[in-house]
Curated annotation (Swiss-Prot):
Identification of the protein by name: Uncharacterized protein MG225 homolog
Keywords of the record: Cell membrane, Membrane, Transmembrane, Transmembrane helix
One CC-aspect GO term: plasma membrane
Membrane topology category: Multi-pass membrane protein
Organism in which the protein naturally occurs: Mycoplasma pneumoniae (strain ATCC 29342 / M129 / Subtype 1)
Length: 491
């Protein structure tokens, strides 16, 4: 593993973490909470609790090796014996699942941008113009993904510019929401009615609760990436940075949910979206408050934020499979660099995986939801979050394994006991939510839909691709071992 020079002070990295986690993931999923009426607050605090537990876990395990990159994969190598097949399988799956989470999130950005511009007159309700918007948005993000394979990177000044635009839009969203609430303040009463939604009786099932939980968890995702950056930070207390950043993000989200709770939300109805003060998406907030000009301001701001992240996404994610290839869990061709020092094979593999996944998760939800951009964005958020939550469970088990091996993770026994209880609670709740999300029919009320099949198929296929590559390397590994065995002499 490469050893890095320190690039961030504590304060710089604290701002970096808050900016990395808090953002459009929150405003693209926050309104989905109000499908559950007053239970939205229960889900918000439950998601925040699990996020805090995850933060504590990553903060604890990040102290294992502060000087090398690798993240959860590196920790799994230290916790398990790579000479045993079952342990190698766990180590590989930890690294591979971390890789495939990014392609599963790939459709969110284009869907989110399209949902921002769909409110322009002449688009919504017009099939031809809708398809033009879809084609333009998808092609644009396809081009961004291609450009990101060229090693494009953003310097600190440019990142600061994009961050400034992003936060200007985020804060404007809260201010504009207050203006809309002032015009029509019925949202607080309707959104907190357990029985009646905006237009019909609420249908709250365990499947619906799990879906909203996992969808909203997207707004807190990022700890798995941040924890791999310990070599870049000049600090002796990485744990403090993560906890302070969580508190900052939580407070921002709490204020945001408190404000959004006053909006007349129509997430349960397909009729009259965006009319008469009824809010189906954040784009509707701007359109109702300031018309086309405000809507364009929001759309352009969201676009700038997405461009800044998408330009480096392929390169960043390709780095996740490098250690797997270097350790012979994946074909070594992925670890080969060209004359310019770029790992082109890993980059193009990541590009192909991302584009195929983005295409499927972009078009299928749109078509099956009758081109409901908001619902499609929420679905795209949920499937990526599901893979991320699986990653968190793997990290919890890594910590349990390290404790079993009596690794020096804790200085005080009470801290170890308390965190073990919290991590156990985290595993239980995440497993429960994943179970009802992946198999919602087990609650006896939710009907199986095409999107449920799509989730299992897409995630399952990506896992099978990884296992096929892993088994190929295992076969080569065993063949190589056999070649080293000296044959017995014939007498």
């Amino acid at each position: 593993m490469a050893v890095a020079s320190k690039k961030f002070t504590e304060r710089q990295f604290l701002f970096f973490v808050v900016n990395y986690i808090a953002g459009f993931g929150f405003i693209s999923t926050a309104l989905s909470l109000f499908e559950l009426g007053p239970l939205s607050w229960v889900i918000f605090f439950l998601v925040s609790l699990i996020s805090l537990i995850v933060t504590l876990a990553f903060a604890r395990v990040s102290a294992i090796d502060k000087n090398n990159y690798g993240g959860a994969y590196l920790w799994a190598k230290k916790a398990f014996n790579s000479e045993r097949y079952s342990h190698r399988l766990f180590i590989f799956f930890t690294g591979w699942n971390n890789f495939i989470a990014s392609p599963l999130y790939a459709a969110i950005a284009p869907l989110f941008i399209l949902s921002a511009f769909k409110g322009i007159d002449g688009i919504q309700g017009n099939a031809a113009n809708t398809w033009i918007l879809i084609a333009a948005g998808f092609t644009f993000y396809l081009l961004l993904a291609f450009l990101s394979t060229k090693g494009t990177s953003l310097n600190k000044k440019l990142i600061a510019v994009f961050a400034s635009i992003k936060w200007a839009v985020l804060l404007s969203t809260l201010i504009v929401a207050l203006i809309v609430i002032g015009k029509n303040g019925n949202g607080y009463a309707i959104n907190n009615d357990i029985k009646q939604g905006p237009f019909k009786e609420r249908e709250i099932t365990l499947g619906a609760v799990a879906t909203v939980f996992i969808t909203f968890f997207y707004s807190y995702s990022g700890a798995e990436d941040i924890s791999t950056m310990t070599p870049d930070v000049k600090t002796t207390n990485f744990r403090k940075i993560l906890i302070i950043s969580f508190i900052a993000v939580f407070l921002f989200y709490f204020v945001g949910i408190l404000i959004f709770n006053g909006l007349l939300n129509v997430s349960q109805s397909d009729d009259d979206k965006g009319k008469d003060g009824r809010i189906a998406s954040v784009a509707d907030i701007f359109r109702l408050a300031g018309g086309l000009g405000a809507l364009i301001f929001y759309g352009v701001g969201a676009l700038f934020n997405n461009v800044s992240t998408r330009l480096s996404t392929i390169i960043a994610n390709s780095r996740k499979i490098l250690p797997l290839a270097q350790d012979n869990y994946l074909p070594t061709t992925f670890s080969k660099a060209n004359s310019k020092g770029e790992f082109q094979n890993a980059i193009w593999f990541t590009f192909g995986t991302t584009i195929i996944t983005m295409t499927v998760l972009f078009f299928v939800p749109l078509i099956t939801s009758n081109f409901d951009f908001d619902k499609s964005t929420e679905y795209a958020s949920s499937i990526g979050s599901a893979a991320t939550l699986v990653q968190y469970i793997l990290v919890f088990f890594i910590i349990f394994r390290l404790i079993y091996k009596k690794e020096q993770l804790y200085q005080k026994n009470w801290t170890r006991e308390l965190e073990q209880i919290l991590f156990g609670i985290g595993v239980f709740i995440i497993l429960l939510m994943l179970l009802f999300y992946l198999f919602p029919v087990i609650d006896g009320k939710t009907k199986w839909q095409l999107k449920n099949t799509l989730t299992l198929v897409v995630y399952g296929v990506l896992i099978l691709i990884g296992f096929a590559l892993f088994m190929t390397q295992e076969y080569k590994r065993n063949k190589q071992k056999e070649s080293y065995v000296t044959p017995r002499a014939v007498t």
